[in-house]
A protein has these predicted regions:
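Helical element adjacent to the flavin cofactor pocket in flavoenzyme catalytic cores
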Residues: 31-36
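Short beta-strand to alpha-helix junction loop
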Residues: 19-29
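Short linear capping/connector segments at secondary-structure termini
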Residues: 11-17
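Conserved C-terminal structural/oligomerization subdomain of aldehyde/semialdehyde dehydrogenase
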Residues: 1-3, 37, 50, 57-198
């Protein structure tokens, strides 16, 4: 699949455009090099696309055999790369995914409904996709957990981030009340006080 991604100018019929800036491309290529020195094996991509020397283009990349402790498995690479490592079982997959300090989104592929619901429940991510990566709905919230951003965009939760909730309590009688001040047991509204309850 990664080899079929058409890369180029976003005004053309392509699947993926360039990274945002030269420094982002340089940073991303360093991330890939570090992943390779830590044991990752390039299965597809791994550099810059042939024929696109001008611009900040990078290959869609798949890395295999990446050790769970590699930096790319624990940091956001912010680039077109899928680092892959083998796990013993579902429990280990959840544990490894959750140990990252980031939690924007997670994708799981399974035909087991119980397993998919457990992943949705246990993955520490703002969004979880099951068998449908990056399927989107503008009525739903977009955002991460941990160090993957603050708040939510889109949906009711996104609108809430533009509101400021305020509590205002007004007593139009404007007479002093003593029930918030010490000694509380002597307050006029305290149950069992001389004045009874109001």
């Amino acid at each position: 699949f990664a080899r079929q991604v058409r890369i180029g100018n976003g005004l053309d019929r392509v699947d993926m455009g360039p990274l945002a800036a030269r420094r982002e491309l340089e940073r991303y290529l360093k991330v890939l090099e570090q992943a390779k020195t830590e044991g990752g094996r390039v299965l597809a991509g791994g550099g810059r696309p042939a024929g696109l020397k001008r611009g900040w283009f990078a290959d869609a990349t798949v890395l295999g055999d990446v050790p769970p402790g590699a930096a790319i498995m624990n940091n956001e690479p912010v680039g077109p790369v899928a680092p892959v490592c083998r796990v013993r079982d579902f429990n280990e997959a959840i544990t490894l995914a959750n140990r990252s300090r980031y939690g924007l989104g997670a994708t799981i592929y399974t035909l087991d409904l119980e397993e998919s619901m457990r992943a949705v429940r246990e993955l520490e991510a703002g969004m979880v996709w099951v068998n449908a990566p990056l399927l989107d709905n503008d009525a739903g919230p977009f955002g991460g957990r941990k160090q993957s951003g603050l708040g939510r965009q889109l949906g009711a939760e996104g609108l809430d981030s533009f509101r400021h909730t305020k509590l205002a309590m007004i007593d139009y009688a404007a007479r002093p009340h003593d029930f918030w001040w010490f000694p509380y047991a002597d307050a006029e509204s305290f149950p069992g006080s001389r004045g009874g309850t109001k």
